[in-house]
Amino acid sequence: KRLDRIKTTFAAFKFDWKADCDHVLTAIAVKKYNNPELSWKVQREAYKLLEGRAGCRLQKRLENLRIRMFWKRVPNEEIDKMTKMDIIAADKRLTEIFINIIREMALKYDV
């Protein structure tokens, strides 16, 4: 049973990796905190791991993106919608590292 779960975890994240990551993070929140609404805590943990492993600062990248969008006269509604996940999606290296972190977290918390 555990081997099947490991296979499923590593086979996931092919088509819509953002939705898959969100699903896994919510499942970890349920397992760890018994509350799916606390998935933001798990997401914060994943971001910290990503920043450490990739040697990047997501918040600074997000601020820089918002400044560039402002100078390109992008509407404020679109600027406000930008998230750290958008930063990760824009960089293939960060995307791969983040997916691997989520896989490791899924195995760690047995989700």
Question: Residues of each region from the PLM?
Answer:
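Positively charged, phosphate-engaging catalytic surfaces used for nucleic-acid and nucleotide handling
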Residues: 1-111
